[in-house]
């Protein structure tokens, strides 16, 4: 492991020198590529440097222990050595995690699709609650969150389904564990007997695809236009600005009516289609790895119930990792960091175990 770390540090230093070369700076494509690689190695090199300093200090402390005759000084050195000895394995564990293979999709933006499931009107209201939860979390993270498509439910404030585009730093890598069935237990406002109802909504988080990721042939597309029910001023229900695209080979259908022009809706619909096809490719690749790692967190099995929101007890439980929190109101306001961090740590532990198996 340490030979690999030294090799990474050597490469990091070489890139650092190249980035100050005027010829490299003048070549913007090369400069961007090197700068991206530099950024990806920076955290590993910093952690390796910290480990190296700690190891050197520990070796020096051991040497002083052997040569120190003064009892008081010897006691101080032993105390320092004990602290360093305790710290070193933690730094080594951090390095192992940083060396784990990166999912190239983690750095991408994401599309979140939320659909009401079983439970009637209450499921539609819960889908709207989840949408607001993710919107608020995105706001806390400093991300951009835009609505791509929305279908309202039968009661005010409810949703049949909604698609959100979330843009920012490492969005997909942070949100990918949210894919799955989310269950809610609460007393509906219309319930006169005070009985708790159970309903559900499904969440799918897709990495946003770029045009180079997926080849889409024009002859494989059926494009329909229809009158928009969304914003658009005087054009609403008069001009066919909404767009529906069907990808014939896969059967995937996407639609967008949120923008004011047909061209804008078509561009957004194509973005959604590319992401769905890219997600399909990734899912096929992951099938071959399923026997190696069956963690529901990392495979994103959307058919499984991943989380329960129990409103009467103010409790959220993530069933994949046994995480429980009694801060349900805060979580519904977008305070998801403790939950997401627990999922990421579990994923890291699973991957470390797979690497050493």
Curated annotation (Swiss-Prot):
PROSITE patterns membership: RF_PROK_I
Record's keyword annotation contains Flavoprotein: no
Domain of life: Bacteria
Protein keywords: Cytoplasm, Methylation, Protein biosynthesis
N5-methylglutamine found at: 234
Cellular compartments annotated: Cytoplasm
Stored SUPFAM superfamilies: Release factor (SSF75620)
Modifications the protein undergoes after translation, according to the UniProt entry: Methylated by PrmC. Methylation increases the termination efficiency of RF1.
KW Repressor (keyword) present: no
CC annotations in GO: cytoplasm
GO molecular function: translation release factor activity, codon specific
Entry function: Peptide chain release factor 1 directs the termination of translation in response to the peptide chain termination codons UAG and UAA.
The family this protein is said to belong to: Belongs to the prokaryotic/mitochondrial release factor family.
The protein, known as: Peptide chain release factor 1
Organism lineage string: Bacteria, Pseudomonadati, Chlorobiota, Chlorobiia, Chlorobiales
Gene name tied to this protein: prfA
